[in-house]
């Protein structure tokens, strides 16, 4: 793989992995606010899947970049994350949460699907495996959408006005898709423009049907001003401090609890052979 293609490939994979990483924490945060025990267990399962996908991609990229294990999760700051900017704003209500997560799930899948038949070894298998789990996420969210109250549906229509333009911007424009070196080299097996169209035809059309919306002409697109193409977000933007603290806590007790498994295992290995435990009472 050419060095330029390698850098672009890593950046694109991080856009997917980091968006999954943030979305997984959305599910964790909202988990105890479910309307029923079934809701809570569903969010727990979706969080587990989503964070599992993010960490699998992190491990894959750490191998690609010859980085130490867990570097991508614990070794970056909030300004280095490639997440979808839409997820930086917390949900205002239940309807907003459903709209935002449904949009995010659909967008992640369509972007990931552009690597489904990649010439890069190992990528296609991950896409197929992740796709099966993401399908059930979307089914669950569709069920919540269809069973929503009239009040929640109005909240969803309002949320569409703010959430959808940011999600569409994530796919960037036609010109970038046409000049994509990853597509021409076969690393990406279908174009981002095709992914954007599929996102509109599937995810957005389902939302419009569920919300009895005739069209989205009232939704104003966002111009790509000072756009960071590699991170697919506004240049210089970073995760809000409260969201980042929830993802990577800094207080001492939580840091101990959130240590990578490899570190925890090393700390406890041969515990009784250590000097501090070798003295008789």
Describe these PLM feature segments.
Residues 1-14, 75-101, 118, 151, ...:
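Acidic/His metal-coordination segments adjacent to aromatic residues that form catalytic metal sites
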Residues 8-15, 34-53, 97, 122-135:
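Alpha-helical scaffold segments that form or flank carboxylate-/histidine-based iron centers
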Residues 13, 43, 98, 127, ...:
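Hydrophobic packing residues in well-ordered alpha-helices of helical domains and bundles
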Residues 18-21, 48-55, 102-106, 128, ...:
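Generic structural signal for well-ordered, non-transmembrane alpha-helical segments
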Residues 23-45, 107-124:
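Helix-loop segments that flank and shape redox-cofactor active sites
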Residues 47-75, 141-146:
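Conserved alpha-helical segments that form or flank metal/cofactor-binding pockets of metalloenzymes
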Residues 86-140:
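Internal, conserved structured core segments that host functional sites
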Residues 154-281:
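Extended, helix-rich structural scaffolds rather than catalytic motifs
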């Amino acid at each position: 793989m050419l060095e330029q293609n390698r850098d672009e490939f890593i950046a694109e994979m991080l856009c997917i992995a980091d968006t999954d990483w943030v979305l997984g924490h959305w599910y964790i945060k909202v988990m105890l606010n479910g309307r029923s025990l079934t809701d809570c267990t569903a969010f727990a399962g979706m969080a587990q899947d989503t964070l599992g996908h993010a960490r699998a991609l992190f491990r894959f990229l750490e191998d690609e970049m010859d980085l130490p294990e867990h570097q991508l999760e614990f070794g970056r700051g909030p300004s280095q994350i490639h997440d979808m900017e839409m997820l930086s704003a917390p949900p205002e209500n239940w309807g907003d949460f459903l709209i935002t997560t449904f949009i995010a799930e659909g967008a992640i899948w369509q972007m990931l699907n552009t690597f489904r038949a990649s010439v890069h070894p190992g990528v296609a298998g991950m896409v197929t495996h992740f796709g099966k789990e993401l399908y059930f996420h979307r089914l669950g969210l569709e069920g919540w959408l269809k069973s929503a109250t009239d009040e929640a549906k109005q909240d969803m229509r309002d949320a569409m006005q703010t959430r959808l333009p940011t999600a569409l911007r994530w796919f960037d424009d036609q010109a970038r898709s046409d000049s994509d070196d990853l597509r021409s080299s076969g690393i990406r097996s279908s174009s981002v423009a095709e992914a954007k169209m599929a996102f509109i035809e599937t995810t957005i059309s389902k939302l419009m049907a569920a919300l009895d919306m005739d069209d989205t002409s009232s939704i104003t697109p966002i111009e790509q001003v000072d756009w960071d193409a590699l991170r697919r977000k506004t240049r210089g933007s970073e995760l809000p401090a409260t969201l980042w603290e929830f993802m990577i806590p800094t207080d001492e007790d939580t840091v101990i609890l959130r240590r990578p498994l490899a570190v925890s295992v090393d700390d406890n290995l041969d515990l009784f052979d250590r000097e501090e435990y070798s003295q008789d009472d």
